[in-house]
Amino acid sequence: MRSLTTKTSSALLTVWGLLSVSLMPSVGQADKTAGDYFVHSLPGAPAGPLLKMHAGHIEVTPEHHGNIFFWHFQNRHIANKQRTVIWLNGGPGCSSEDGALMEIGPYRVKDGSNGPKLEYNPGSWDEFANVMFVDNPVGTGFSFVDSDSYIHDLPEMADQFVQFLEKWFALFPEYEHDDLYLAGESYAGQHIPYITKAILERNKKPDAKHKWPVKGMLIGNGWISPVEQYMSYLPFAYEKGLVKKDSEKAKKLESQQAICTKMLNENGGRDKVDNSQCEQILQEILSTTQSKGSDGNMQCYNMYDVRLKDSYPSCGMNWPPDLVNVTPYLRRSDVVAALHISPEKRTGWTECNGAVGSAFRAANSKPSIQILPELLAEVPTILFSGAEDLICNHIGTEELISNMEWNGGKGFELGSGTWAPRRDWEFEGEPAGFWQEARNLTYVLFYNSSHMVPFDYARRTRDMLDRFMKVDIASIGGAPTDSRIDGEKGLETSVGGHPNSTAAAEAEEERLEAAKWNAYYKSGEIVLVIVVIAASAWGYYIWRERRQRAGYAGIFGGDTPMALAGARSGSRGAAGLEDFRNKRNARDVEAADFDESELDELHVRSPTDDMDRDRYSVGSASDDESIGKRNGNGKGKEKSYS
């Protein structure tokens, strides 16, 4: 019996030891606090106070070493309430660091003299909202998982994302009651609706301690309805003049479109997220329209911005240009350390992971267009499109809206025979696009923009976001941007014009710098006046001495030591004063207008006062316009919508 007990104890200890080893990563994760994720410094960041940010991994599947990476930026200012935006890029398998460093994040990566450096993004979305970029699903970007454990379907991805949020909010409970917005582009048009649905279902469970208040979805150039998107390729090519209608090229493309239509109408084709025969339409457009460039090499249209050309068969895979700086920046060892990248992440950052995209076939998933109507009953949504994108073009988005029934109507129908108007949008005096809305859905078309709208027009997308979130700066001050829809300004939204925004801070610094030099200049004038007065007094003194000495000379004779000394002094004094007068005549300070109040101002705001003055937070929003991802057709034939 004792032997059996000993063996049993030994066996239990062995089992416990194995369990302890297997649970070690989870325990390590559980022991982490928010402070462990705090980013203390960021290589290449602009001078001044660093934005408040957290970054790192949250473990979601310990048994497969599955970790999701996030990069969270705290809002710079609060308008009337706390808001959090979660941003997702597409692919599937493309990193949301595209969004962080090329689109809506606070920084853009530029080429510096000593390597990549960060500059403030004039239209970053973190002015009045916390913004979190998530590399989703596992295996994407800085996220990682065992290579045999990639995600395959949309519901599985959404459930894992909710699990990530549960753990994230446990670490950062102060954000759990924020108004929550899910935003992204391209294939995120599948991810976002599925995640939103999973959150709404989670909120209805009795064991949900806190309901997460989902207030909106924003999807740019979204891959939402494959049917409408496939059928839009040829009309878009005609509209943009890529292919001439009734030409031989057009006939070949129409033949491929007929094959696609047949596939969609058979064997549940309309219920599939991807269809290889239909994707061939896009391939044929890019192939049949290729031409020889000035360098003698073949080139094709950039599928993300048809105003541009790229080498064939890349056709946009070398775009956007910022990528040449972003990739080496995110692979720097000091950046990896600053963002708390786990040593378990053994490979460097890549924009799009082909293995993740290959695994994520969504073979058992329905396209998100089929769940969008039910979501619109609860969640306000914006669909926005860049007018020059081919791969997820605006015609496809407009068609899916026209064909969709939601909230008691079809398309943008307002009533019998009436439709929601397209309202012209003007931003800072330029035509920016149009807005159209009905029954909880808003559609925005951005003129002259690509697949990655925020890359082109970050400030305009920030204006769109602030309008959608109903940010109103009237009560907090600041200069609103001049943004008008059908000539009406609506709520006062700020795009880098808030008193504490980056642009405002930069403008304030320029103003202070000018004031400082103005103060120095005025100080110089004052010194000059003092010198003139002193010189005049000295000159008067010398003149009086000469007069007196002249009198002494008349009494004592001209050869006395005193007379000679007086003559030499007088000569030097007169010559020196005359020279000074000649210089002074060029600019008579005393004769110039002089405002005594300037002396008071100089006293109030001296150069040292300016240096001691508290600066505004460096990293508020700023101002400027500044593109998306990724059909992987040029990369191993894998399609990736970023």
From Swiss-Prot:
Record field: compositional bias (Basic and acidic residues): 600-616
Catalyzed reactions: Preferential release of a C-terminal arginine or lysine residue
Subcellular location: Golgi apparatus, trans-Golgi network membrane
Active-site residues, Swiss-Prot/TrEMBL: 186, 389, 451
Secretion signal, residue range per the UniProt entry: 1-30
Membrane topology summary: Single-pass type I membrane protein
InterPro entries per UniProt: AB_hydrolase_fold (IPR029058), Peptidase_S10 (IPR001563), Ser_caboxypep_ser_AS (IPR018202)
Side of membrane Lumenal, spans: 31-522
BP-aspect Gene Ontology terms: apoptotic process; proteolysis
Keywords, in A-Z order: Apoptosis, Carboxypeptidase, Glycoprotein, Golgi apparatus, Hydrolase, Membrane, Protease, Signal, Transmembrane, Transmembrane helix
Its EC number(s): 3.4.16.6
Cellular component, GO annotation: membrane; trans-Golgi network
Keyword Magnesium: no
GO MF annotation terms: serine-type carboxypeptidase activity
Keyword Transmembrane appears in the UniProt entry: yes
Residues passing through the membrane, by range: 523-543
PANTHER family: PHEROMONE-PROCESSING CARBOXYPEPTIDASE KEX1, SERINE PROTEASE FAMILY S10 SERINE CARBOXYPEPTIDASE
Role description: Protease with a carboxypeptidase B-like function involved in the C-terminal processing of the lysine and arginine residues from protein precursors. Promotes cell fusion and is involved in the programmed cell death.
UniProt name for this protein: Pheromone-processing carboxypeptidase kex1
Gene: kex1
